[in-house]
């Protein structure tokens, strides 16, 4: 009985605009920051190193970025009202669901190989046929 009541309350706060996230994705998380009486949007850009799925109230993902040579990790509740939006900017090719090994890597070794997707480049158009010279 209590579980159903909790599930009903959580269902009201579930976000519908959450993109499909996976470990290795490059994301930009736009969060609402309140400073005094003003509110602004702050962007945190990095790689998803862990995604814990569960009930809507408990699902979270961890994003890691390098800031001036220091690794910064931040955990975000997926359905938080403080998150304005989540943009997926790329998909890394990984074979693990938790990428905690990236913590021990530095420089180019910490980069992930980006998945090859459909080419976004437009096909080359053929040049117009030249008029016959008379």
Swiss-Prot record:
Transmembrane segment boundaries: none
Pfam family, one: Ribosomal_L19
GO biological process, one term: translation
InterPro entries: Ribosomal_bL19, Ribosomal_bL19_sf, Translation_prot_SH3-like_sf
GO MF, one example: structural constituent of ribosome
Assigned GO CC terms: cytosolic large ribosomal subunit
Region Disordered, residue ranges: 110-134
Alphabetized UniProt keyword annotations: Ribonucleoprotein, Ribosomal protein
Bias-annotated ranges (Pro residues): 125-134
Gene3D superfamilies in the cross-refs: 2.30.30.790
SUPFAM superfamilies in UniProt: Translation proteins SH3-like domain
Function, in words: This protein is located at the 30S-50S ribosomal subunit interface and may play a role in the structure and function of the aminoacyl-tRNA binding site.
Similarity comment: Belongs to the bacterial ribosomal protein bL19 family.
Name listed for the protein in its UniProt record: Large ribosomal subunit protein bL19
């Amino acid at each position: 009985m209590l579980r159903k009541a909790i599930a009903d309350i959580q269902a009201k706060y579930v976000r519908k605009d959450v993109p499909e996230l996976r470990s290795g994705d490059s994301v930009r998380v736009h969060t609402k920051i309140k400073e005094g009486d003003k509110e602004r949007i702050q962007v945190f850009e990095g790689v998803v190193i862990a995604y814990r799925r569960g009930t809507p109230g408990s699902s979270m993902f961890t994003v890691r970025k390098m800031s001036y040579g220091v690794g910064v990790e931040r955990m975000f509740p997926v359905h938080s009202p403080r998150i304005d939006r989540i943009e997926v900017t790329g998909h890394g090719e990984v074979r693990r669901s938790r990428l905690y090994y990236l913590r021990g890597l530095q420089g180019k070794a910490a980069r992930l190989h980006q998945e090859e997707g459909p080419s976004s480049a437009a096909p080359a158009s053929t040049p117009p046929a030249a008029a016959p010279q008379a």
